[in-house]
């Protein structure tokens, strides 16, 4: 009989959002006449912008024309998309990249989960706490976690992000090899100032670490002094990989397109006396394990950068931002301590003192038909909080606020 990779047996039996879905399904089955409003999983609700739909239609028609048909594309992404990414996401912010430092994919989640494959198995990983579960689980699968004790892994370094430090992590006491940072943050909705991000870049340069920087929510930044890219910080190209997504920016959660930036200046030890390029290694990995994002999807992503596309997605994002502002204001008026929601689509809500995260989740679901995400599902430091998302419709957001008020 074949033998399992035992690291997979260390994983919790269920993924956080699968647990939530199971509870919600049970509630709906028991209460078929009650309409449930979800402020839980961070999926968008607005349809794709018309400019994107038009580009999709055109690309589909091309695939039906023998003279225009495209088969396998470049694993790294088509030049037409990499060029506009380089121009509109980076050059306009004073960041210089080469097209071959951009790798287009079918999602930031697989890229974030897979990039750790390039590092030695005994590499030390640091994550913020609370944390997006993929950062931890992918390293558990890779055999880097050690053993679980008191809900934390023995070989993973946790960096608490709590009220007392304004949700900005302190530098780790133990030097890690890989540092996962996500800003604007999921789940807390908080951000790093330019000075704070510069501090992390300087730390990584000093200690020889690599920052894996997830900026999937950068389009929601409203404050001028908050960096949109880690490469706005001098020297970051030598210590950081950046993950970007079209999912929340342009509603691509069901279409799937993202990209990862791996600067050619970024090198790590070869385990001997030399160093190797992470750009070259990621390119090699992708050529072996990935056949590229579909042509029609990349044409749709290209349309996001058109003048019409930018206008349309900015309108959609503005709607989600209004939802976040409504949730923040209403929750504050109800007496909740509220964080995030200014530069991100997430609200981090402190639950009443007499309950815990899952208890408050159950109360909202059972008494108000509302779905949130329990903070404890993101780590120890998330206990006592829940995450609310602003991705609903304005009408559902207003109704959710009304239901929440009825409990207070």
Curated annotation (Swiss-Prot):
It catalyses: (2S,6S)-2,6-diaminopimelate + 2-oxoglutarate = (S)-2,3,4,5-tetrahydrodipicolinate + L-glutamate + H2O + H(+). Pyridoxal 5'-phosphate binds at residues 72, 108-109, 132, 186, 217, 245-247, 256, 291. Pathway: Amino-acid biosynthesis; L-lysine biosynthesis via DAP pathway; LL-2,6-diaminopimelate from (S)-tetrahydrodipicolinate (aminotransferase route): step 1/1. InterPro entries: Aminotransferase_I/II_large, DapL/ALD1, PyrdxlP-dep_Trfase, PyrdxlP-dep_Trfase_major, PyrdxlP-dep_Trfase_small. One of its GO terms (molecular function) is pyridoxal phosphate binding. Involved in the synthesis of meso-diaminopimelate (m-DAP or DL-DAP), required for both lysine and peptidoglycan biosynthesis. Catalyzes the direct conversion of tetrahydrodipicolinate to LL-diaminopimelate. Belongs to the class-I pyridoxal-phosphate-dependent aminotransferase family. LL-diaminopimelate aminotransferase subfamily. Homodimer. This is LL-diaminopimelate aminotransferase. It comes from Desulfovibrio desulfuricans (strain ATCC 27774 / DSM 6949 / MB).
């Amino acid at each position: 009989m074949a033998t399992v990779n035992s690291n997979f047996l260390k994983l919790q039996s269920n993924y956080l959002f699968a647990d939530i879905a199971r509870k919600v399904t049970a509630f709906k089955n028991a209460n078929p006449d009650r309409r449930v409003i979800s402020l839980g999983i961070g999926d968008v609700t607005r349809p794709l912008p018309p400019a994107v739909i038009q580009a999709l239609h055109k690309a589909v028609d091309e695939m039906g024309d023998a003279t225009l048909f495209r088969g396998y594309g470049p694993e790294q992404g088509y030049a037409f998309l990499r060029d506009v990414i380089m121009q509109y996401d980076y050059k306009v912010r004073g960041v210089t990249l080469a097209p071959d430092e951009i790798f287009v994919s079918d999602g930031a989640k697989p890229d974030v989960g897979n990039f750790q494959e390039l590092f030695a198995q005994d590499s030390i990983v640091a994550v913020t706490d609370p944390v997006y579960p993929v950062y931890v689980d992918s390293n558990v699968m890779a055999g880097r976690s050690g053993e679980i004790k008191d809900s934390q892994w023995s070989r993973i370094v946790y960096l608490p992000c709590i009220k007392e430090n304004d949700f900005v992590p302190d530098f780790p006491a133990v030097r890690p090899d890989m540092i996962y940072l996500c800003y604007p943050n999921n789940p807390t909705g908080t951000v790093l100032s330019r000075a704070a991000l510069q501090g992390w870049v300087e730390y990584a340069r000093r200690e020889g670490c690599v920052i894996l920087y997830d900026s999937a929510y950068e389009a929601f930044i409203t404050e001028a002094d908050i960096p949109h890219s880690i490469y706005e910080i001098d020297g970051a190209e030598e210590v950081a990989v950046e993950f970007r997504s079209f999912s929340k920016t342009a509603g691509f959660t069901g279409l799937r397109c993202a990209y990862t930036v791996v600067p050619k200046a970024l090198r790590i030890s070869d385990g001997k006396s030399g160093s190797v390029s992470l750009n070259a290694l990621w390119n090699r990995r992708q050529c072996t394990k990935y056949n590229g994002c579909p042509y029609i999807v990349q044409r749709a992503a290209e349309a996001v950068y058109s003048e019409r596309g930018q206008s349309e997605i900015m309108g959609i994002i503005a709607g989600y931002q209004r939802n976040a502002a409504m949730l923040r204001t209403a929750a504050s008026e109800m007496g909740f301590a509220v964080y995030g929601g200014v530069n991100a689509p997430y609200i981090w809500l402190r639950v009443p003192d007499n309950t815990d995260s899952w208890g408050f989740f159950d109360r909202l679901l059972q008494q108000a038909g509302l779905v949130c995400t329990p903070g404890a599902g993101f780590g120890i430091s998330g206990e006592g909080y829940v995450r609310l998302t602003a991705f609903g419709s304005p009408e559902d957001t207003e109704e959710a606020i009304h239901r929440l008020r009825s409990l207070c």
